[in-house]
Amino acid sequence: MIQAIIFDLDDTLYPENEFVFSGYRAVAREAAARGGCEHEAAFDCMRTAFHAADRKEVFPRLMTRFPGLSMTLEDMVRVYREHVPEISLFPGYDSLLEELGKNYRLGMITDGLPSVQRGKVRALGIEGLFEKIVYSWDYGKERQKPHLHPFALMLETLRIEPQSALFVGDNPEKDGRGAIGAGMNYARVAASTGVAPAWVQAALPGEIAMENLLQLPEILIQLPRILK
């Protein structure tokens, strides 16, 4: 019997590209304020680079396009990481989480810089919906998913057995392998923004697949039969 549902954050509860473009907006505003470019031109440059190149090349391409910028690469990274993000949950997910919380214990495990991930959670206004949030990089980047540590910590905190937990995430390589390795059940929700690399989208044996979280209540009803 499932007692707890543990969620991933990025591209599971909200579209990660919203955070990415929100960060680019913040960098564009700062760059324009310091001089050397127009806000919209800077943002368009970064957005185009995001779709055409590796994400690590976005800021260098901006600096190449506007050589008169009064910002260093370090300045851009700092503004991007420290900005207050303009992001929102996928439609219908706020009420879904509230309903699930009436019958299940809810948790979250998320990778990434803890300050950035905490900023996302605050911006989404969802911290109070979860009994426990594990920011894996609090314990070292090497312990991010699929390392067993964040999953074991969640189970220990909630004091439940692995088979009583369902982990929901978009990335089978990180979420799926970590959850299954910890003995949890795993449900994969299709990533809809394309931020995750395509190679991680292959299914894992034993995973439960769904198009979006709005299908989760029905899956929970069917789960005893699915797991037989």
Where are each of the predicted segments found?
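Asp-based, Mg2+/Mn2+-dependent phosphohydrolase catalytic module
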Residues: 1-2, 98, 113-114, 118-228
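N-terminal helical cap/lid subdomain that shapes the substrate entry/recognition surface
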Residues: 2-95, 115
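Structured helix-beta-strand junction loops
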Residues: 102-103
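Conserved phosphate-coupling serine/threonine residues in phosphotransfer and NTP-handling enzymes
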Residues: 110
